[in-house]
Amino acid sequence: MLRRYFAAALVAACCATTATAADNDSPAPYHVGSAMRVFHPGVARNWRGAQTEALVTNLWYPVDADIPEAAHTIDEGGRPLFQGHALTNDAPVSAAHAKYPLVLLSHGTGGTAASLDWLASALAANGYIVAGVNHPGNNSLEPLTYEGFMLWWERATDQSEALDGLLADPVLGQRIDTARIGAAGFSLGGYTVLELAGARTDLQAFLNFCASPAADAICHPPEMQRLQGGAPVPAHFTPQMSASMARSSASYRDTRIKAVFAIAPALGEAFNEASFSGVEIPVSLMAGTGDVTVPVETNLHRVAGFMPNAKVTLLPGATHYTFMDTCVPAVVERLARICQDPPGVDRDAVHTQAVEAALDFFNHTLPATTQ
């Protein structure tokens, strides 16, 4: 029974600083630098069926405002998909401060770190280093795999091991204020950062929900159609998959992380009353009231009910994909599901609200030092 529900429901689970600009009329204090790192963890990630064994990580960071930025688009398959923030590649980190706070970034199912460029760039422009892992087996840079799609809890290990790599990095490691590390995530990435905060998964609770009449869209995410070209679910779990399932309810708390910001967090039904007993750091939850992909009632509200001290922000009318980058005009009609918002919803304005909330949250929970 568990195997049947795991195949039918769990595979389908889940779609998806220092100085700040005081208001929308004030320019951000920094320009945005961009770089990439490839970290090789102790356990190679290709056991998930992924094409890469490494943790490919996008970086955004503050650079001096006199360094020119260039406009760019975020491409997929060699074609522009999203409008990116202006940035400069591989420029030196600003010398205005010796160290900067760090925010780890976790994307949603089948997405990429770059699909959250709107948030990462804004944080960097306001004095944060941001690192976004492209989760192996669950990103749009390579085929989705069953392991990457089903074994959600493994994503927290990606973040922690990328953090290990960052702190050891000869260029950026010494520029990170290790007392000021946070995490932000969208959709399945929202679930991921809650795990980093100490939340524990109740896999059976989620399976029961998706097998019940109450099952909703979280049990059948649209990204499921991309799962290895619609190939049948494997009849047998590999030893690695079985071992992973056995640790699904483990704690993935990373004590280096001091605060988490979860946008449209998914898998609310994979938590129970005891799941958050180990969460002792500040948590902020945000979603749009128009989200039908990760319904607010069974996800954000359920999680918030277990964490009465969490900050909750609901943005009227915003849908799930409103929290992805703004699409380039050429693809808006073709990719209507992720590119188009309801009448009256301005995606860029929603992003501005979300950025302001994230900056306010992290500025208070990762307070500035004299460095």
Q: Which residues make up each language-model segment?
A:
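Catalytic active-site module of serine/aspartate enzymes centered on a nucleophile-bearing elbow/loop
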Residues: 328-371
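Alpha/beta-hydrolase active-site loop
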Residues: 148-174, 178, 195, 204-232, ...
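Short substrate-entry loop that stabilizes the transition state in hydrolases
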Residues: 85-100, 105-142, 292-295
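Short beta-strand/loop motif that positions the catalytic acidic residue
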Residues: 279, 285-287
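Domain-level recognition of soluble alpha/beta enzyme cores
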Residues: 22-103
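Short alpha-helix in the alpha/beta-hydrolase fold that links the catalytic acid
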Residues: 275, 281, 295-305, 327
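Gly/Ala-rich beta-loop-alpha elbow adjacent to hydrolase catalytic centers
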Residues: 185-189, 193
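Conserved alpha/beta-hydrolase "acid-adjacent" motif
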Residues: 271, 292-298, 323
